[in-house]
Amino acid sequence: MAKLRDLMNTSVVIAGPDTTVTEAAAGMVRARVGSVVVMQGTFLAGILTERDVLRAAASGEDLSVSLVAKWMSPDPHSASPDMSAEEAAQIMLLNGFRHLPVVDGRVVCGVVSIRDLFAAKIRRPARGLAEPG
């Protein structure tokens, strides 16, 4: 059973709630990730995802002045590095989100996406399924 520590992306983009949406989106593009972890000091305050950026863009607001705090999902669910991929997938599916911060103690050490979980499942087919050939 795969653990999140083996699947998570450790290239975490971090922003504060007072970061503009444009700056946060640029960070996602540079790092080639779909989310930004929002920190208030050492506290995990929220997560801003591609979907949130799309909602902000569709609102017509000027994203160069609109702040992450307005669009982020506050107090996000998080997972431990020792959580199984299956448990993380269940949490994500039940709650309707695609990104899950991974926290070791109080430190954000990565983010796992539904794509990461799917890729891990494809790399290790379930028992009883024929290998592609």
Q: What role is predicted for each listed range?
A:
Residues 2-12, 66-76:
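Bateman (tandem CBS) regulatory domains
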Residues 84, 108-133:
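Cytosolic regulatory modules rich in charged/polar residues
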Residues 55-66, 125-126:
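Short, charge-rich, low-complexity interaction segments located
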